[in-house]
Amino acid sequence: MAELSIASGIVGLLSLGIQVTQSLISFYSAYKDQDGDLAKITQNFEDLQGIFQSLESAVQDRQSQGDMDEVLKEVDKAMQGCHEIIEELQKECQKLHTDLGLSLKGHIQVAGRRAAYPFRKSTLQKLKEDTARNQNQLDLFLHSLPKDLDETYERILCSIDENYVDDVCRILTLLCFSARPLTINELIDAHAVDLSASPHLDREGRSYEQNDLIDICLGLIEISKTEDSGQQLLIARIAHFSVQEYLQSERIQQQKANRFAIQSGPANTEITQICLVYLLEPMLSSGVLDTIKIKEFPLAHFAAEYWYHHYVNSREGRLKVEELLQRLFQYDTNCFVTWIRIYGLDRQGTLRPNSDYQRPIDDIGSPFYYASLLGLESTLSNMIAAGARDASFLEMVNAQSGEYGNALQAASSGGHWKVVQMLLDQGADVNAQSGRYGNALHAASSRGHKKVVQMLLDHGANVSTQGRELTLW
């Protein structure tokens, strides 16, 4: 609606400009044969009218292109000069005619009653200069109009204060690639994560407010209201899909705004880092975990549930987050337990709640188990390297743990064949009975992971264990 209002105002103003210049052309045309100056002035008015018509056409063309809110705002801003020019033309028109509604014939009759040449040379000279100046201004304005959305977005991005460039890049990255829409409070906390040499949640950055984000992003984002379980939420979004398309396009790479370009791999890597740093925040894991604590850390649920989604989509950027993963999957920290309590990923597909803030420790699998469930090869490899010399390591490999019973069944259910091979190499019991599927072979078969099924069979998996029916393919 705002877009239509802006467009209507611009078109209305230009239409008035066309009307006024037509009236002036009609008047001066009656005299233009008497003096070269009058002929020049008439031509100037005709040129002005042509520019107004071109501007009107340009605005209407842009309006028809779809979401052109930012283009029209740019046009409206630049139209301030047109306001002044048209007001000046109106005053000139009012000097000559008390009634703009007179027909051309009426103007000629009025002119005929005047003296044969009622114009002063000084007046004509000034009018000629004024119309030429107005023509130049409008012509410059016409050529300065953004040709399309790309040029509009480029101008907006290049006009962002240098002090806020990194902030805007972070915000746009989050909104373009977050696994689900972010609330304004989630976005503020995600923006507040400092990924410098010592990654941490920056207290000062958390003091941002909704209007701060909107102001520095110059119309590239918007806030909408929605309801979830009766609670009203403010959701932050990219203002239009065309903004995201431009930011991810190859075109932006060739433009001045190229530092704002966003690519899937690096963007997902950055969001993975943000989520992991947030989960490693000491204050989140200290004290009692309850709804009050979660309210203090609004990004906690998103970070707990979606860091793995973004990790998978990081591609070659996964190595950059390995150190953070090692910290999260440590045995002697509360961060790991807090993560699982916020989002128990192994409870997916069960009747048990994913979020269980008071989930007993003995109901939570080991970091080794969850690394196997997610197929985190590097993380698991480091754990194996660190624990291989420990006499109790084999017990950990086969430990009864979590919804899937043990690490091998967890890895098999996800089809993580490389992890399955690592576990088998470490002596994992291929026929261990426990968990959701009973054993690793049934887990792999039920999920259609043929390669894992074959690997388990090659290592002695018993097809008829406990009488379960096994479908191999």
Curated annotation (Swiss-Prot):
Signal peptide, first to last residue: 1-23
ANK repeat coordinates: 403-432, 436-465
Alphabetized InterPro entries for the sequence: Ankyrin_rpt, Ankyrin_rpt-contain_sf, PigL_N
Residue positions with a glycan: N462
Recorded superkingdom: Eukaryota
SMART domains, A to Z: ANK
Use in biotechnology or industry: As colorants, MonAzPs are widely used in various food products for centuries. Moreover, MonAzPs also possess wide-ranging biological activities such as antibacterial activity, preventing hypertension, lowering cholesterol levels, causing hypolipidemic effects, and displaying antiobesity and antitumor activities.
Keywords: ANK repeat, Glycoprotein, Pigment, Repeat, Signal
Induction conditions: Expression seems not to be regulated by the azaphilone pigments (MonAzPs) gene cluster-specific transcription regulator pigB.
UniProt xrefs under SUPFAM superfamilies: Ankyrin repeat
GO molecular function: pigment binding
Biological role stated in the UniProt entry: Part of the gene cluster that mediates the biosynthesis of azaphilone pigments (MonAzPs), a complex mixture of compounds with a common azaphilone skeleton very widely used as food colorants. Seems not to play a direct role in the biosynthesis but might have a regulatorx function.
Protein name: Azaphilone pigments biosynthesis cluster protein L
